[in-house]
């Protein structure tokens, strides 16, 4: 399995908190100066270094981005171009500087959360020696010789009985499944092997045992399944019903879980309309809002507000000021090179904007901004407005940031930074030279004709998939174009094509971030 450069580098357990320092890789000595006045303008805090957590040789002076004109982080026209690695480092540094504390909750409230620490048994399992069957507890030595054997029944022990019982030689006690084995008993004979009928009935005065069991039969000894102190669950485990049952069964009433970062999602653009509203010329449904809400929840975050604003800085600033407290703001749209880029105009002194050498989703922004009535400084990640760009860049960067902020460091699918599998292209397609391509793909596991979605990509003849090999094809004939939102429902992975490649030929291998099992 190909592992992408990870956000969190610990092996197991909660992530350690790091405080990034240093300037942006493209910044110079004057780059921390405040920009021109704007809505709620103030001096921009230092942008995290792109070298946090990953030693890397210094970039030669001739290879560094050249910045001309106004500083790029105050709305200038000349944004630096970063590699996908450099942008990932900026997002990583932002997340590492805002790692959230663990939460301790009643176990019953932890469904769907992730365990923050390794869990060990507080008690043995079973916690006491008990009967594995409905029947009669006795001493095996009392069944000597040939049967049947008749014994007096001196007590009736239901499940949950807390009384102390002492079994004497030559006696029997009726016992139910799960009930504590009385002191002195070492064997349980099933009710079916006696003259006593199963079911609801009074305990008999005597019992006739017709089949002699082995010594220790139908007895569960305390601790035979699990000793106290034994490991039960590991940190990072998703707490489903089975995991919670295991935790409670070994004595845990509360659990320490990873936090779910609170996220404010912001869709920008006067052209956006609520789902189902009638559309006028130039208007489109706001698909980014529900897309981001779903992606955030799937990645372990919790959306506390979805804001939809127009293209004026005053409107966006007011919406952020009135938003609830959050741990992260994610914006969609308003960061490109147009005349009405509302996010850039509003957050120009708060966030760093740059271009990433990737397709789709070149324009990106990272920083922090005041949110809520108290003006709490909150991390912000700014994404482009095209839905395919939102989809791919969220999976490649933002999902990992949420995992880091929550302290999750285990590389589980859909929960941390992308891991890739190697697959082969069912058909060929073009890839832009000089840019990393993130292309939504579907897996093709059966031989046959090329799907209509992948037809006409211009990569030569389609290849018939071989058994035992994972094959992929684009979900849309136009490949990775950023406006193809309707095709995202078919996406099962994101192909990663290196910038120097230029094209993918049918049958060639490529890395694929799998979004499904």
Regions from the PLM with identified roles:
Residues 68-85, 253-383, 387-393, 411:
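Helix-rich terminal scaffold detector
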Residues 73, 78-79, 119, 136-310, ...:
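Short, glycine/charged-enriched hinge/interface segments at domain edges or termini
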Residues 85-88, 103, 107-108, 116-117, ...:
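Flexible glycine/proline-rich
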Residues 115, 127-128, 153, 163, ...:
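Short, conserved secondary-structure segments in the cores of folded domains
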Residues 129-131, 143-146, 164-168, 181-183, ...:
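Solvent-exposed alpha-helices and their adjacent loops that cap or buttress functional pockets
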Residues 79-148:
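Intrinsically disordered, low-complexity, positively charged segments
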Residues 8-66:
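Compositionally biased, low-complexity flexible segments
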Residues 4-7, 73:
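Aromatic (phenylalanine/tyrosine) cluster motif
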């Amino acid at each position: 399995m190909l592992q992408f450069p990870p956000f969190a580098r610990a092996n197991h357990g909660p992530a350690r908190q790091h405080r990034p320092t240093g300037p942006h890789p493209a910044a110079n000595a004057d780059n921390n100066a405040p920009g021109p006045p704007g809505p709620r303008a103030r001096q921009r805090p230092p942008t995290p270094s792109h070298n946090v957590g990953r030693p890397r040789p210094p970039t030669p002076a001739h290879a560094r981005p050249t910045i001309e004109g106004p500083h790029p982080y105050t709305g200038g026209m000349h944004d630096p171009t970063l590699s996908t690695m450099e942008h990932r480092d900026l997002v990583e540094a932002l997340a590492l500087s805002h790692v959230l504390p663990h939460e301790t909750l009643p176990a019953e409230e932890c469904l769907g959360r992730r365990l923050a620490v390794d869990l060990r048994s507080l008690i043995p399992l079973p916690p006491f020696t008990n009967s594995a069957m409905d029947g009669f507890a006795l001493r095996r030595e009392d069944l000597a010789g040939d049967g049947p054997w008749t014994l007096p029944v001196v007590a009736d022990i239901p499940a949950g009985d807390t009384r102390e019982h002492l079994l004497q030689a030559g006696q029997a006690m009726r016992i139910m499944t799960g009930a504590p084995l009385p002191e002195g008993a070492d064997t349980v004979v099933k009710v079916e092997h006696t003259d006593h009928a199963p079911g609801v009935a009074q305990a008999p005065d005597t019992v006739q045992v017709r089949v002699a069991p082995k010594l220790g039969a139908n007895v569960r000894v305390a601790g035979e399944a699990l000793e106290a102190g034994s490991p039960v669950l590991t940190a990072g485990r998703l707490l489903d019903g089975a995991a919670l049952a295991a935790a409670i069964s070994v004595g845990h009433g509360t659990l320490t879980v990873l936090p779910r970062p609170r996220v404010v999602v912001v869709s920008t653009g006067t052209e956006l309309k609520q789902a189902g509203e009638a559309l006028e010329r130039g208007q489109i449904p706001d698909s980014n809002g529900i897309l981001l809400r779903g992606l955030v929840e799937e990645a372990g975050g919790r959306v506390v507000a979805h804001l939809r604003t127009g293209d004026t800085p005053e409107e966006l600033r007011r919406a952020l000021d009135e938003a609830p407290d959050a741990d992260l703001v994610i914006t969609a749209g308003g960061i490109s090179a147009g005349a009405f880029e509302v996010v850039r105009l509003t957050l120009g002194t708060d966030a760093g904007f740059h271009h990433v050498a990737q397709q789709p989703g070149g324009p990106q922004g990272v920083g922090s901004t005041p949110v809520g009535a108290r003006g709490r400084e909150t991390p912000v990640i700014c994404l482009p407005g095209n839905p395919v760009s939102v989809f791919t860049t969220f999976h490649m960067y933002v999902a990992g940031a949420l995992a880091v902020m929550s302290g999750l460091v285990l590389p589980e699918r859909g929960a941390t930074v992308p891991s890739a599998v190697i697959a082969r292209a069912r058909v060929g397609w073009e890839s832009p030279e000089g840019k990393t391509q993130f292309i939504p793909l579907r897996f093709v596991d059966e031989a046959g004709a090329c799907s209509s979605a992948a037809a006409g990509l211009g990569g030569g003849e389609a290849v018939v998939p071989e058994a035992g090999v994972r094959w992929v094809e684009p979900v849309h004939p136009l490949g990775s174009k950023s406006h193809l939102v309707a095709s995202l429902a078919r996406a099962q992975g994101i192909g990663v094509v290196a910038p120097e490649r230029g094209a993918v030929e049918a049958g060639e291998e490529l890395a694929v971030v799998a979004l499904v099992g």
